[in-house]
Protein backbone atom coordinates (compact mmCIF):
# COMPACT_ATOMS: atom_id res chain seq x y z
CA UNK A 1 0.00 0.00 0.00
CA UNK A 2 1.36 3.40 -0.95
CA UNK A 3 1.45 5.76 2.03
CA UNK A 4 2.17 9.48 2.22
CA UNK A 5 5.72 8.61 3.30
CA UNK A 6 6.18 6.83 -0.03
CA UNK A 7 5.47 9.97 -2.05
CA UNK A 8 8.23 11.14 -4.34
CA UNK A 9 10.81 13.35 -2.73
CA UNK A 10 12.06 14.69 -6.05
CA UNK A 11 8.91 16.43 -7.28
CA UNK A 12 9.83 19.70 -8.90
CA UNK A 13 8.51 23.01 -7.63
CA UNK A 14 5.07 23.41 -9.10
CA UNK A 15 4.81 25.37 -12.30
CA UNK A 16 1.12 26.01 -11.76
CA UNK A 17 0.30 29.69 -11.73
CA UNK A 18 -0.91 31.24 -8.51
CA UNK A 19 -3.97 32.54 -10.38
CA UNK A 20 -4.91 28.98 -11.35
CA UNK A 21 -4.57 27.79 -7.78
CA UNK A 22 -6.57 30.75 -6.44
CA UNK A 23 -9.36 30.12 -8.93
CA UNK A 24 -9.82 26.50 -7.90
CA UNK A 25 -9.38 27.27 -4.20
CA UNK A 26 -12.19 29.81 -4.49
CA UNK A 27 -14.38 27.32 -6.36
CA UNK A 28 -13.69 24.66 -3.74
CA UNK A 29 -14.51 27.00 -0.88
CA UNK A 30 -17.70 28.56 -2.22
CA UNK A 31 -19.30 26.14 -4.70
CA UNK A 32 -22.52 24.54 -3.36
CA UNK A 33 -22.99 20.83 -2.76
CA UNK A 34 -24.58 19.06 -5.75
CA UNK A 35 -25.25 15.76 -4.00
CA UNK A 36 -28.87 14.67 -3.97
CA UNK A 37 -29.86 16.25 -7.29
CA UNK A 38 -31.62 13.85 -9.66
CA UNK A 39 -28.91 14.25 -12.29
CA UNK A 40 -26.23 13.61 -9.65
CA UNK A 41 -27.92 10.36 -8.65
CA UNK A 42 -27.93 9.37 -12.33
CA UNK A 43 -24.25 10.37 -12.59
CA UNK A 44 -23.42 8.22 -9.55
CA UNK A 45 -25.26 5.26 -11.04
CA UNK A 46 -23.19 5.60 -14.22
CA UNK A 47 -19.92 5.79 -12.30
CA UNK A 48 -20.67 2.73 -10.19
CA UNK A 49 -21.45 0.79 -13.35
CA UNK A 50 -18.08 1.84 -14.82
CA UNK A 51 -16.30 0.56 -11.72
CA UNK A 52 -18.21 -2.73 -11.77
CA UNK A 53 -17.64 -3.36 -15.47
CA UNK A 54 -14.05 -2.23 -15.89
CA UNK A 55 -12.17 -2.49 -12.58
CA UNK A 56 -11.26 -5.67 -10.69
CA UNK A 57 -13.04 -6.35 -7.37
CA UNK A 58 -12.46 -3.30 -5.21
CA UNK A 59 -11.60 -5.00 -1.93
CA UNK A 60 -7.95 -4.14 -1.24
CA UNK A 61 -7.51 -2.38 -4.59
CA UNK A 62 -5.36 0.78 -4.53
CA UNK A 63 -7.60 3.27 -6.37
CA UNK A 64 -6.35 6.75 -7.26
CA UNK A 65 -8.59 9.62 -8.37
CA UNK A 66 -7.12 12.57 -10.27
CA UNK A 67 -9.26 15.20 -8.55
CA UNK A 68 -11.51 15.24 -5.49
CA UNK A 69 -14.31 17.46 -6.77
CA UNK A 70 -16.81 14.60 -6.75
CA UNK A 71 -15.87 13.64 -3.20
CA UNK A 72 -16.41 17.19 -1.97
CA UNK A 73 -19.37 18.33 -4.06
CA UNK A 74 -20.88 15.67 -6.29
CA UNK A 75 -21.16 11.86 -6.51
CA UNK A 76 -18.72 10.80 -3.75
CA UNK A 77 -17.65 7.91 -5.99
CA UNK A 78 -14.27 7.36 -4.31
CA UNK A 79 -15.90 7.28 -0.88
CA UNK A 80 -18.31 4.65 -2.26
CA UNK A 81 -15.34 2.63 -3.56
CA UNK A 82 -13.75 2.87 -0.11
CA UNK A 83 -16.88 1.38 1.43
CA UNK A 84 -16.48 -1.57 -0.97
CA UNK A 85 -12.99 -2.13 0.46
CA UNK A 86 -10.82 -0.06 -1.88
CA UNK A 87 -7.82 1.86 -0.56
CA UNK A 88 -8.61 5.40 -1.62
CA UNK A 89 -6.07 7.97 -2.81
CA UNK A 90 -6.59 11.28 -4.54
CA UNK A 91 -5.29 14.75 -5.22
CA UNK A 92 -6.80 18.12 -5.98
CA UNK A 93 -5.33 21.50 -6.83
CA UNK A 94 -7.69 23.08 -4.28
CA UNK A 95 -6.93 22.72 -0.58
CA UNK A 96 -10.56 23.48 0.47
CA UNK A 97 -11.71 20.69 -1.86
CA UNK A 98 -9.26 18.20 -0.33
CA UNK A 99 -10.37 19.13 3.18
CA UNK A 100 -14.06 18.79 2.31
CA UNK A 101 -13.48 15.53 0.43
CA UNK A 102 -11.95 13.88 3.50
CA UNK A 103 -15.24 14.34 5.35
CA UNK A 104 -17.00 12.00 2.88
CA UNK A 105 -15.02 8.97 4.07
CA UNK A 106 -16.50 6.96 6.91
CA UNK A 107 -14.84 3.54 6.52
CA UNK A 108 -11.16 4.21 5.96
CA UNK A 109 -9.56 7.66 5.68
CA UNK A 110 -8.77 9.15 2.31
CA UNK A 111 -5.09 9.57 1.52
CA UNK A 112 -5.52 12.97 -0.12
CA UNK A 113 -2.97 15.58 -1.10
CA UNK A 114 -3.01 19.08 -2.55
CA UNK A 115 -1.23 18.59 -5.86
CA UNK A 116 -1.39 19.14 -9.61
CA UNK A 117 -2.37 16.24 -11.88
CA UNK A 118 0.62 17.17 -14.06
CA UNK A 119 3.06 16.74 -11.15
CA UNK A 120 1.85 13.83 -9.05
CA UNK A 121 3.64 13.35 -5.71
CA UNK A 122 3.64 9.54 -5.94
CA UNK A 123 6.22 6.96 -6.92
CA UNK A 124 6.02 5.05 -10.19
CA UNK A 125 3.55 2.14 -10.31
CA UNK A 126 1.84 3.15 -7.05
CA UNK A 127 -1.76 2.27 -7.96
CA UNK A 128 -3.80 -0.68 -9.21
CA UNK A 129 -6.55 1.46 -10.72
CA UNK A 130 -6.93 5.10 -11.72
CA UNK A 131 -10.17 6.98 -12.16
CA UNK A 132 -9.92 10.35 -13.90
CA UNK A 133 -13.33 11.73 -14.80
CA UNK A 134 -13.54 15.38 -15.80
CA UNK A 135 -10.01 16.44 -14.85
CA UNK A 136 -7.60 16.69 -17.76
CA UNK A 137 -9.86 18.91 -19.88
CA UNK A 138 -9.26 21.72 -17.41
CA UNK A 139 -5.51 21.92 -18.08
CA UNK A 140 -4.02 23.04 -21.37
CA UNK A 141 -1.29 20.39 -21.40
CA UNK A 142 -3.58 17.38 -21.03
CA UNK A 143 -1.00 15.00 -22.48
CA UNK A 144 1.39 15.77 -19.65
CA UNK A 145 -1.36 14.90 -17.19
CA UNK A 146 -1.95 11.58 -18.95
CA UNK A 147 1.76 10.75 -18.86
CA UNK A 148 1.73 11.30 -15.11
CA UNK A 149 -1.33 9.08 -14.69
CA UNK A 150 0.37 6.37 -16.75
CA UNK A 151 3.51 6.69 -14.66
CA UNK A 152 1.79 6.05 -11.33
CA UNK A 153 -0.34 3.15 -12.66
CA UNK A 154 1.24 -0.25 -12.05
CA UNK A 155 1.92 -2.56 -15.02
CA UNK A 156 -1.26 -4.53 -15.61
CA UNK A 157 -3.33 -1.86 -13.87
CA UNK A 158 -6.38 -0.20 -15.38
CA UNK A 159 -7.35 3.42 -15.87
CA UNK A 160 -10.71 4.94 -16.73
CA UNK A 161 -10.26 8.39 -18.24
CA UNK A 162 -13.24 10.62 -18.93
CA UNK A 163 -13.47 13.94 -20.78
CA UNK A 164 -16.22 16.01 -22.44
CA UNK A 165 -17.47 14.44 -25.66
CA UNK A 166 -16.83 16.78 -28.58
CA UNK A 167 -19.54 14.98 -30.57
CA UNK A 168 -22.21 15.08 -27.87
CA UNK A 169 -25.52 15.04 -29.78
CA UNK A 170 -26.97 17.55 -27.32
CA UNK A 171 -24.13 20.01 -28.08
CA UNK A 172 -22.91 20.50 -24.52
CA UNK A 173 -19.42 21.63 -25.70
CA UNK A 174 -21.03 24.56 -27.51
CA UNK A 175 -23.00 25.52 -24.41
CA UNK A 176 -19.85 25.34 -22.27
CA UNK A 177 -17.84 27.35 -24.81
CA UNK A 178 -20.50 30.06 -24.95
CA UNK A 179 -20.61 30.31 -21.16
CA UNK A 180 -16.81 30.46 -21.02
CA UNK A 181 -16.78 33.28 -23.58
CA UNK A 182 -19.26 35.20 -21.43
CA UNK A 183 -17.31 34.55 -18.25
CA UNK A 184 -20.24 32.59 -16.82
CA UNK A 185 -18.83 29.07 -16.75
CA UNK A 186 -18.26 27.93 -13.18
CA UNK A 187 -15.52 25.45 -14.02
CA UNK A 188 -13.07 27.79 -15.75
CA UNK A 189 -11.10 26.61 -18.76
CA UNK A 190 -12.47 23.46 -20.39
CA UNK A 191 -11.99 21.71 -23.71
CA UNK A 192 -13.66 18.72 -25.33
CA UNK A 193 -12.24 15.73 -27.19
CA UNK A 194 -13.27 13.27 -29.85
CA UNK A 195 -13.14 9.59 -28.97
CA UNK A 196 -10.27 9.13 -31.41
CA UNK A 197 -8.26 12.03 -29.95
CA UNK A 198 -8.58 10.63 -26.42
CA UNK A 199 -7.59 7.16 -27.59
CA UNK A 200 -4.49 8.48 -29.36
CA UNK A 201 -3.44 10.55 -26.34
CA UNK A 202 -3.70 7.51 -24.08
CA UNK A 203 -1.64 5.46 -26.51
CA UNK A 204 1.04 8.15 -26.67
CA UNK A 205 1.15 8.05 -22.87
CA UNK A 206 2.05 4.35 -23.09
CA UNK A 207 -1.36 2.85 -22.32
CA UNK A 208 -3.37 0.33 -24.31
CA UNK A 209 -7.05 1.12 -24.86
CA UNK A 210 -9.31 -1.84 -24.12
CA UNK A 211 -12.81 -0.31 -24.08
CA UNK A 212 -14.60 2.89 -25.08
CA UNK A 213 -17.92 4.06 -23.72
CA UNK A 214 -19.45 7.21 -22.25
CA UNK A 215 -21.63 8.33 -19.36
CA UNK A 216 -24.37 10.90 -18.81
CA UNK A 217 -26.70 10.47 -21.76
CA UNK A 218 -28.50 13.69 -20.94
CA UNK A 219 -28.50 17.21 -22.40
CA UNK A 220 -25.85 19.31 -20.71
CA UNK A 221 -28.29 22.18 -20.28
CA UNK A 222 -30.66 19.86 -18.37
CA UNK A 223 -27.88 18.79 -16.01
CA UNK A 224 -27.03 22.47 -15.40
CA UNK A 225 -30.69 23.38 -14.88
CA UNK A 226 -31.27 20.47 -12.52
CA UNK A 227 -28.28 21.48 -10.41
CA UNK A 228 -29.38 25.11 -10.33
CA UNK A 229 -32.86 24.12 -9.16
CA UNK A 230 -31.44 21.71 -6.59
CA UNK A 231 -29.32 24.49 -5.09
CA UNK A 232 -31.56 27.54 -5.43
CA UNK A 233 -35.16 26.40 -6.04
CA UNK A 234 -35.94 22.99 -4.61
CA UNK A 235 -39.63 22.96 -5.66
CA UNK A 236 -38.57 23.18 -9.32
CA UNK A 237 -36.04 20.38 -8.79
CA UNK A 238 -38.98 17.97 -8.84
CA UNK A 239 -39.70 19.13 -12.39
CA UNK A 240 -36.11 18.85 -13.60
CA UNK A 241 -35.85 15.47 -11.88
CA UNK A 242 -38.83 14.27 -13.89
CA UNK A 243 -37.07 15.47 -17.06
CA UNK A 244 -33.91 13.56 -16.12
CA UNK A 245 -35.80 10.30 -15.60
CA UNK A 246 -36.43 9.37 -19.30
CA UNK A 247 -32.73 9.70 -20.10
CA UNK A 248 -31.77 7.54 -17.12
CA UNK A 249 -34.41 5.00 -18.17
CA UNK A 250 -33.01 4.79 -21.70
CA UNK A 251 -29.50 4.45 -20.31
CA UNK A 252 -30.52 1.50 -18.13
CA UNK A 253 -32.58 -0.34 -20.74
CA UNK A 254 -30.95 0.59 -24.05
CA UNK A 255 -27.17 0.38 -23.52
CA UNK A 256 -26.46 1.54 -27.07
CA UNK A 257 -27.30 5.13 -26.08
CA UNK A 258 -24.44 5.22 -23.58
CA UNK A 259 -22.00 5.82 -26.41
CA UNK A 260 -23.56 9.26 -26.84
CA UNK A 261 -23.12 10.44 -23.26
CA UNK A 262 -21.59 13.87 -22.76
CA UNK A 263 -18.57 12.46 -20.92
CA UNK A 264 -16.44 9.98 -22.83
CA UNK A 265 -15.09 7.15 -20.68
CA UNK A 266 -12.14 5.30 -22.17
CA UNK A 267 -10.65 2.30 -20.41
CA UNK A 268 -6.94 1.59 -20.78
CA UNK A 269 -4.38 -0.75 -19.29
CA UNK A 270 -0.66 -0.39 -18.71
CA UNK A 271 1.26 -3.17 -20.47
CA UNK A 272 3.15 -5.60 -18.28
CA UNK A 273 6.89 -5.11 -18.22
CA UNK A 274 8.54 -6.99 -21.03
CA UNK A 275 5.15 -7.60 -22.64
Predicted regions and their residues:
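Class I SAM-dependent methyltransferase SAM/SAH-binding core
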Residues: 62-119
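A C-terminal cap/extension of S-adenosyl-L-methionine-dependent methyltransferases
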Residues: 176, 211-275
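A short acidic, Gly/Pro-enriched loop at the edge of an enzyme's catalytic core
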Residues: 118-129
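Conserved class I S-adenosyl-L-methionine
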Residues: 2-59, 158-182, 223
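Short alpha-helix
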Residues: 189-206, 212
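A short glycine-rich, Lys/Arg-flanked "PGG" loop and its adjoining helix->strand segment in the class I
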Residues: 143-158
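Acceptor-substrate binding/catalytic loop of class I
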Residues: 38-42, 180-197
